[in-house]
Amino acid sequence: MQKLWEGRFSEASSALLEEFNASINFDKKLYKDDIEGSIAHSSMLANCGILSKDEVDKIKNGLNQILNEIESGNFEFKISDEDIHMAIEKRLAEIIGKNTAGRLHTARSRNDQVATDFRHFCMRENLAIAELLRTFVKALVEIAEKNIQTLMPGFTHLQHAQPISLAEHLLAYAFMFKRDFERFISSYERNNFSPLGSAALAGTPHMIDRFETAETLGFKAPMSNSMDGVSDRDFALEILFNISVVFTHTSRLCEELILWNSQEFGFITISDAFSTGSSIMPQKKNPDVAELIRGKTGRIYGNLISLLTTMKGLALAYNKDMQEDKECVFDSVKEVHTSVVILREMLKTAKFNEKNMLKACKKGHLTATDLADYLVREKNIPFRKAHFIVGKCVATAESLGLDLSEMSLENLQKIDGEIDENALKCLDLFNSKNSRKSYGGTADESVRVQIEILKKWLKK
């Protein structure tokens, strides 16, 4: 099979080389970006007087025919074509003739063509993933709004710590995913510049208009340095990093859902639609969705490390190593789309078991800090002394087989006479939760403020 670059060569390519060198099996995903880039490039060449109107019309018609062939499944992808860019150019030559098709590549190298296609793909995905995260935040806010007064134990070190609102817990994730959204938007704003026209590395002697192609393709402007345009993949690293952070957050949430779904916790029941069974144990109902997302996180991290390692030792400008930039991005992009959607839908159909959460709040002395704060605030006792007093109260409660909230005033006063009837109010779980009215706290009114913040953001 004739190569578009074979003029300098006297021998045909080895079949081993063709198989090893080809990227068409995965970079064919960029077909639409490549065709859009070529149409924009040909229009610009015509506007600059480099191509005639007739030539451009033939090129555009041919490219649109190729687009239809690919999308209808009638385009034959061949390893011998090496990559999607060469495959499209070769097919274009078959449709409109070699001479006219060959003029499309005027003032363009595969280096800037590839960089443009890939950057265009990543910019589009930055926006698509951001929108996906927005819908996830919306779902979390809706669930939280229904559970402002649902009490559950808050944890540190996976030990019972303080009583909190389930809404507060879910909103913590909502704010994390909000920041994830902002990272993708920030990456889009920072990287939405066009490499097209950088050519191989040093620009081109043809009098082209890079600003025109940048605008046509939705970029803010052309990249200011042609070597930078073809050499770097920081935009790809950023989308991989951003997706890795999303998976850090989804993995943490999934870990909690797995725990909460267990018989030991019983805080949540995942619907049958998002659970699986066992091949041998008839009673099993497994949280496989959450486990898979948690498991996929390692692969997502690996994709980021893979590209970081690929790029770290490359001299400017383009190197073939950079062909390894795409599979990791395509994989991470696919996984973030599927994982966020299924996690969102699983949460929307899950049932939170309020009785079990409340029951759990009556274990672990969740209001101990409230009693210490009361002694500091109302009795002017230094916090370290108050901490010691309440520690004694907890030890006594445990020796009696009670939770601190179940201790009588008589037993508490035996430990320290400063503890009075008003102190008992601090031991009430709901009083404890609603006393934490500081900005961002778990009191009902503070949680409603958080919900309003997110609702206003969602409307923007």
UniProtKB/Swiss-Prot annotation:
Pfam families: ASL_C2, Lyase_1
Keywords, comma-separated and alphabetical: Amino-acid biosynthesis, Arginine biosynthesis, Cytoplasm, Lyase
Single GO cellular component term: cytosol
GO MF annotations, alphabetized: argininosuccinate lyase activity
Segment forming the signal sequence: none
SUPFAM superfamilies, alphabetized: L-aspartase-like
CDD domains: Argininosuccinate_lyase
InterPro entries in the record: Arg_succ_lyase_C (IPR029419), Argininosuccinate_lyase (IPR009049), Fumarase/histidase_N (IPR024083), Fumarate_lyase_CS (IPR020557), Fumarate_lyase_fam (IPR000362), Fumarate_lyase_N (IPR022761), L-Aspartase-like (IPR008948)
Catalyzed chemical reaction(s): 2-(N(omega)-L-arginino)succinate = fumarate + L-arginine
Gene Ontology biological-process annotations: arginine biosynthetic process via ornithine; L-arginine biosynthetic process
Family, per entry: Belongs to the lyase 1 family. Argininosuccinate lyase subfamily.
Name of protein: Argininosuccinate lyase
Native organism: Campylobacter hominis (strain ATCC BAA-381 / DSM 21671 / CCUG 45161 / LMG 19568 / NCTC 13146 / CH001A)
